[in-house]
Amino acid sequence: MTEADQFAATLAYATWPDKGMIVRGRRLTILTMRECVRPNETTQIIHVAEAIDPSAVLYTMGPKAVLGEQVDGKLVTAPEVEDGDALLPPGLYDGPVVPGPAVDYGYEMSTYRFETPGVHRIVWHLGDLVSNELLIFVE
């Protein structure tokens, strides 16, 4: 994905039709510019956390590792941290804590390559926050 593609995907978030469910004023959303790929082509996944409510906060310093991501029901990243705030990065965090409304694009992108045709499902879980289900069609 080029920088222009990344920028376009970031802009696309505002109008992305399928965002994650809001839980306690926050939500997770994943998006891509390539939902249809050929076998062995890559698709990159952009991760966005959003605080809708002023009482909800985001930890915007990044890039942050993506934890708790599943492809076709299998965990493919490091597991999520179980204790405390699901969006708080593991380890010592000494960055901005931003109240809502705010959007955090400061997560690393995931890159996937699928060999066989079909539909692949990607979901990002952090605590009780669950993203939208992103479908990647391999044709």
Over which residues does each language-model region extend?
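Contiguous segments within soluble domain cores/interaction surfaces
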Residues: 1-10, 19-111, 117-119, 124-126, ...
